From Swiss-Prot:
Carbamoyl phosphate binds at residues 56-59, 83, 107, 134-137, 273-274, 318. Pathway: Amino-acid biosynthesis; L-arginine biosynthesis; L-arginine from L-ornithine and carbamoyl phosphate: step 1/3. It comes from the Bacteria. It comes from Clostridium acetobutylicum (strain ATCC 824 / DSM 792 / JCM 1419 / IAM 19013 / LMG 5710 / NBRC 13948 / NRRL B-527 / VKM B-1787 / 2291 / W). Its main location: cytoplasm. One of its GO terms (molecular function) is amino acid binding. Disulfide bonds: none annotated. It is found in: Cytoplasm. L-ornithine binds at residues 167, 231, 235-236. Belongs to the aspartate/ornithine carbamoyltransferase superfamily. OTCase family. GO terms for cellular component: cytoplasm. Its EC number is 2.1.3.3. This is Ornithine carbamoyltransferase. The gene is argF.
Length: 333
């Protein structure tokens, strides 16, 4: 039986550094095997439910391609394609799907939803994103770091810039604490993560040799950084009345060439989970600018399109890292 067989993947809080390294090593192997035409199928005849209450490009494609590569059959259940939370409770949905499928992926709203699915389905459940966490993204991020940096994760100085209350920032902080990293947040104080989560991560970091630092001073936070990471400043499902104030508040935290230079590290890298606002080629960016007369770019196009950027390496690794999570928890390996 596999090392993590039948485990849920809900939060990196549930895993040890050894568990995370196992998934990262497996992701590397699966990527190499696919490229060399040597990939073995560990998920043959498995049926997988993909519940998407929130739309996605990278997460959906990664799960579907990974399932196909591994010989599994994936069924996509979109926000209009089920009775979840409308005519049927999460608990009842879990009990139904658990009798039809070998595993369930959920991308949607509250963390409690994915926890209820895990409790009542009796099959492995994978968190594709909730409002609170995005753990599959972090495995892809760490996989990319291991590929691109000639040093272990616990020697990497990683800075998250911008709105640090979101699911990506939360999951990164948890993952960094687990792996003993120097993790810093550069954000307005009003956009720091919850004090409860920060305390938990600091306690973990104390045991792993890591360090968690929060600062509203950009120069202080980014000095010596190996990685500058950001995410969008506004989300399309939010109350638009808060956008104008937030866009103004986050201007000093935009990743641009000036911030790159402030790191004093010529080998610094930029990362982003995507999608990104870096130019006016999307309707959403134009709409925000037209309505608020504020540029919504969390990163400049100059940085995004530069050699500093690892955004698309990171995006590619969503596939291989998600495949590793699936194989580790469900596969006959």
């Amino acid at each position: 039986m596999g090392y993590l067989k039948n485990r849920n993947f809900l939060s990196l809080m549930d895993f040890t550094p050894q568990d995370i390294n196992y998934m990262l090593d497996l992701a590397k192997k699966l990527k190499e095997d696919k490229r060399n035409g040597l990939e073995e199928q560990y998920l043959k005849k498995k049926n997988i439910a993909l519940i998407f209450e929130k739309d996605s490009t990278r997460t959906r494609c990664s799960f579907e391609v990974a399932a196909h590569d591994q010989g599994a059959h994936a069924v996509y259940i979109g926000s209009t394609g089920s009775q979840i939370s409308k005519k049927e409770s999460i608990k009842d949905t879990a009990r139904v799907l658990g009798r039809m499928f070998d595993a369930i992926e959920y991308r949607g709203y509250g963390q409690e939803v994915v926890e209820i699915l895990a409790e009542h389905s009796n099959v492995p459940v994978w968190n594709g994103l909730t409002d609170e966490e995005h753990p599959t993204q972090v495995i892809a991020n760490f996989m990319t770091l291991k590929e691109k940096f000639n040093k272990p994760l616990n020697e990497i100085k990683f800075v998250y810039c911008g709105d640090a209350r979101n699911n990506v920032s939360n999951a990164l902080m948890i993952g960094a604490a687990k792996m003993g990293m120097d993790f810093r947040i550069a954000a307005p104080k009003s956009l720091f993560p919850s004090s409860e989560l920060v305390k938990k991560c600091m306690d973990i970091a104390e045991l792993t040799g890591g360090k968690i630092t929060l600062s509203d001073e950009v120069d202080e936070a980014v000095f010596g950084a190996d990685v500058l990471y950001t995410d969008v400043w506004v989300s399309m499902g939010e109350d638009r009345e808060v956008w104008k104030e937030r866009l103004k508040m986050l201007k000093p935290y935009q990743i641009n060439m000036e911030m790159i230079s402030k790191t004093k590290n010529p080998n610094v890298k930029f990362m982003h989970c995507l999608p990104a606002f870096h130019d006016f080629s999307t309707d959403a960016a134009k709409e925000i600018y037209d309505e608020f007369n504020e540029i919504p770019f969390e990163v400049t196009d100059e940085v995004f399109e530069s050699d500093y950027s690892l955004a698309f390496d990171e995006a590619e690794n969503r596939l291989h890292s998600i495949k590793a999570i699936m194989v580790a928890t469900l596969g006959d390996i």
